[in-house]
Regions:
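Glycine/threonine-rich beta-strand-loop-alpha-helix active-site module
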Residues: 136-158
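Ligand-binding beta-strand-loop-alpha-helix segment within the catalytic cores
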Residues: 161-183, 187-191
Length: 348
């Protein structure tokens, strides 16, 4: 594909005390095939990248080049082009929680969002941040997803785990289990089901069945194990069906999720973080990514954390970041339709 036709992606560096710099460097130096799909530009700290390039990968620091804006990037193989944001963070030790690193990780995301809002990049790929470090750095967001939603001014969004053609949409994410139960309410469930329906339509699958996992064991078993499935989820599924969305459920999660892994379902709605994340990561590992649906631009992330325990050792694998970059490049050209369809669904 001609370079003028491929999407420009902002790759945020994540927490520089973690594995973000080294997996970013490996992704851009060792996977030239990505450059035929996109123009990757790092948003972060060039010095932290140089430290990873020389100290972890054993490469020449000269491969890291600072550019003023994404349009200045040449996409030359064997280089890492960086839009510098903020002061150097090369002083931050690997593997230690750092307020400076947490502040930087949040700032990198905010800068990437600003570049997306101005039309300078077509999508965002995020390396992992550490939530405690981000909070120590003065940014009180539960995680990437909520920060991104704030930066783009959207209220209806969902964290989506994806592997191949399988998508796990989450009703709640980074809250306590107690708060997750109360968070599964009628409004939130209606909104997410509309998002799933819009996303499926934008992917050309408007009639695809959407499996909705029950909150309680056995989806409540006719109220034996709780009322939420009967009082909240079942009516929301009916409202979605009335609106032309092919939602099914609530279904027992221990039946629905294995069926989805075996290919029966492409779109699944789960109620809380670990109901989706635990089985997904057990099955897919590095073959999964995290997509935020409900934003005006595509955002895809690795499906792992900062791995402080191995940061700087060279043991980190870049497979998830490579996959996230590939998925963002694939989704970016059609994301305008995803966004417009989602907006139309939210307005209905």
């Amino acid at each position: 594909m001609n370079q003028s036709q491929v999407p420009t992606l902002a790759l945020t560096l994540g927490d520089v005390a973690g594995i973000g710099p080294e997996i970013t460097a490996r992704t851009l130096l060792d996977h030239d095939e990505l450059r035929g799909l996109c123009r990757p530009v790092v948003v972060g700290d060039a010095d932290a990248l140089r430290r990873a390039v020389t100290g972890v990968l054993g490469r020449d620091a000269g491969v890291v080049r600072v550019v003023d804006r994404p349009a200045d990037a040449t996409n030359e193989p064997g280089t890492i082009e960086v839009v510098q944001d903020g002061p150097s963070l090369a002083h931050v030790p690997y593997g230690e929680l750092s307020a400076d690193a947490g502040d930087g990780a949040a700032r990198f995301v905010m800068r990437a969002c600003a570049l997306a809002r101005s039309g300078e990049v077509d999508g965002i790929v995020t390396a992992p941040l550490n939530k405690a470090a981000m909070h120590a750095g003065g940014h009180q967001w539960p995680g990437h997803t909520e920060l991104l939603a704030h930066e783009f001014g959207v209220d209806n969004f969902s964290l989506v785990l994806s592997a191949g053609e399988l998508y796990f949409f989450h009703l709640t994410t980074h809250v306590s289990l107690r708060d997750a139960i109360t968070g599964v309410d009628a409004e939130r469930t209606d909104n997410v089901l509309r998002l799933v329906g819009s996303f499926a339509s934008a992917l050309g699958r408007p009639d695809e069945a959407i499996g909705v996992a029950g909150l309680n064991p056995h989806a409540g078993e006719n109220r034996l194990f709780g009322d939420e499935d009967a009082d909240v989820l079942a009516p929301a599924v009916q409202r979605a069906q009335d609106a032309g969305i092919n939602a099914v459920g609530p279904l027992p999660a221990d039946a629905l999720i294995p069926q989805a892994v075996k290919g029966k379902w492409k779109f699944v709605v789960v109620c809380y973080h670990d109901q989706g994340h635990a089985p997904f990561k057990a099955v897919y590992g590095d073959d999964g990514v995290n997509i935020t649906v409900g934003l005006p631009v595509v955002r895809v992330s690795v499906d792992h954390g900062t791995a402080f325990d191995i940061a700087g050792t060279g043991a980190a694998r870049e497979a998830s970041l490579v996959l996230a970059t590939r998925r963002a490049a694939e989704l970016a050209p059609g994301w305008h339709q995803v966004w417009e369809t989602a907006k139309a669904g939210s307005a209905s």
